[in-house]
Amino acid sequence: MKLSQFNFDLSKDRIAQEPPRWRDEARLMVLHKDSGELEHRQFKDIIDYFGKGDTFVLNDTKVFPARLYGKKEKTGADIMVLLLRELNREQRLWDVIVDPARKIRIGNKLYFGEDESLVAEVIDNTTSRGRTLRFLFDGSYEDFKEALFALGEPYVPEWVKEKVSPEDTENYQTIFAAKEGAVSAPAAGLHFSRELFNRMILKDIEKTFITVHMGIGHFRTVDVEDLSKHRMDSERLIISEEAAEKINKAKRGGKKVVAIGATVMRGLETYVTTTHEVNAFDGWTNKFIFPPYQYSVPDAIVSNFHLPQSTMLMSVAAFGGHKQVMAAYDEALKEGYRFGHYGDALLVL
C-alpha cells in the first residue's frame, strides 16, 4: 500500500494534551471488522466483549526519564539530549539524539544540571542527530543512574504537549510498568486501572505481559510512498516462556488473544511458529506491519487513535482492514474523539 492512503486532516486541538481524569474513562470506539459496525463506549466497558479464558497481552515496559537539558562546553549553548538506550553499563555509554546537533562533534563535552555536576563526552557520530556519549562519573553504577535520571524528564512527544508537567511522570506510565527501558509509553496500556483489572478477575479474563522497550521509531516520519521500502527502528523484545505458554494455551482452547497496543501486535507476530503459536524470545525486532497482512496470533486488538501516516495506524489497518479502519477514524473525527498518547482508544474485533 501507499503512504498517502493513510493520510487524513487532523488539527492540533484534537490531540489530547492531558489524560482523562480516570484512566479507564477514556472513550472507546468498537469496530466489528467483518460488518464494519461501530459502537461508542467507555474504555471500562471493554470487558463486556470478552469472557472466561480470553487473554489480554500487555506491554510491561517502564518509561525512564529520557530527556535531559544541558549546555555545550565553551559556548554554553543550550542543548537537549534524548537518551535512547544504554550501550555499555561499565563504560557509561549511551546512544542518544542531540538537538541542535550542528557543531556537536566528537570530543565535545556536554554539561547537565544547574551546577553542571554531570558531564558527558561525545565519542561517536551515529547519524545526523545521533551521538554516542560517555558519561564521566566516578561513583557506583547505581549512583550514576540515580544522578542521571534525577536530571531527566519523561519524553512526552512535542506534538502531544510542548512542556512536560510533574504530573506526566505518573500519567505517562502504565500502572503495570515493571521493566525499565522505554523512551515512550505504550499508549493503549495507559487506559488500564486497578479497578478494571479487578473486574477482569471477576469475569475470569486472563492477562499476561511481554516487554517491548519502545524507542522513538514509532514517531519517525515515514518518508517513502511505497511502504515496502520503509524500515522500522529495532526495539528490544522479551517474551518469557510463561507468557508464551499462556498465550498458546488460550489459542489452543479457542479463547481470544487480545493485543493491547501496536507494540504488542508487533511483538506477538515477530517469532511465530507455522502452527500460529508464539515462541519465547529475547532479542530485537524491527517488524513493520502494514496491509495486506494476515495476523497469526491476536483475535482482537486495542490501540489509541494515532496520527496521520503513522506506522501504528498502519498496523491497526492491517488487522481491521484499511477501509474499515479509515472509516472508523473518520467517525472519530466527526464524534470528537481525542487522538495521540493521552487520547481515546479503538477496539477492533
What is each model feature region?
Residues 1-349:
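Surface-exposed, charge/polar-rich loops and edge strands
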